[in-house]
Amino acid sequence: MPDFSIENEISKSINKKNCIIVGVDEVGYGSLAGPVVSAASFFLRHDNEIIYNIKDSKKLTPKKRIEVYNTITSIVKWSIGFADVYEIDQHNILNATHLAMQRALNGLNCDIDYVIVDGNKVPDLPWNRKAIVDGDNISVSIAAASIIAKVTRDKLMETLHTQYPEYQWNKNKGYGTKHHLESLYKYGKTIHHRNTFAPLPGITKLYSK
C-alpha cells in the first residue's frame, strides 16, 4: 500500500518544512481513442490516517474508485492536464503525455518544491524531479494522482460514448478491445481516434451516422 515514505525522504533531503511535493500520473497512454490525461496532486499534510484505501487506480473497482476519488479530491490540492488526439498524433504519445503533465502541474498555481512522476521517464520540468517505477504503488501522492486521472478520463470517455455508442467507449475507455477493433473496421474512425496508432493508419473509412 502506498504511503508517504518517498515524500518524507525528499522533504528531509531538501531540509524544508511544509514543502510541496507533487505526485504525477497519467491515464490513456495506450488507448486508440481519446486524450491522454495527467493529474498532479499533493497533500497539505503527511498524515497516514488519511491515506486508507488510496491505491493504484488499476487495483480498485470502478465503484470503489469513485468513492476514493470523492474523498481524496476534498483533501488534496490537485489539477488535471490534457493532451488531445491531434497533439498525440503530432508530437507522439510520450511527448504529448509530458505536455499533459506540464499542464497539470501549471494548473496547481503554487510554488512546487519537488515533482515525483510514475514511470521510468520524467519530462523536462522547471522543478526538481524524479521518476519512480511503480510509483503508484509506492507514493500516496502518485496514487492519488492516478485515481484522479483515471476517474476524469473515464467520465470523458463515457460522455463520448453517448455520441459514438458503436465503439462501446463506456466499457473499453478507448482501448483496443476486440469489439472496438471490429467496430473500427465496420464503422470507420472518428475524430477522437489516434491516427498514428495501429491499426488506424490502415483504416481509411470515416465514421458517419
From Swiss-Prot:
Manganese or magnesium. Binds 1 divalent metal ion per monomer in the absence of substrate. May bind a second metal ion after substrate binding. GO terms for molecular function: manganese ion binding; RNA binding; RNA-DNA hybrid ribonuclease activity. It is found in: Cytoplasm. It comes from the Bacteria. Its EC number is 3.1.26.4. It catalyses: Endonucleolytic cleavage to 5'-phosphomonoester. GO terms for biological process: DNA replication, removal of RNA primer; mismatch repair. This is Ribonuclease HII. The gene is rnhB.
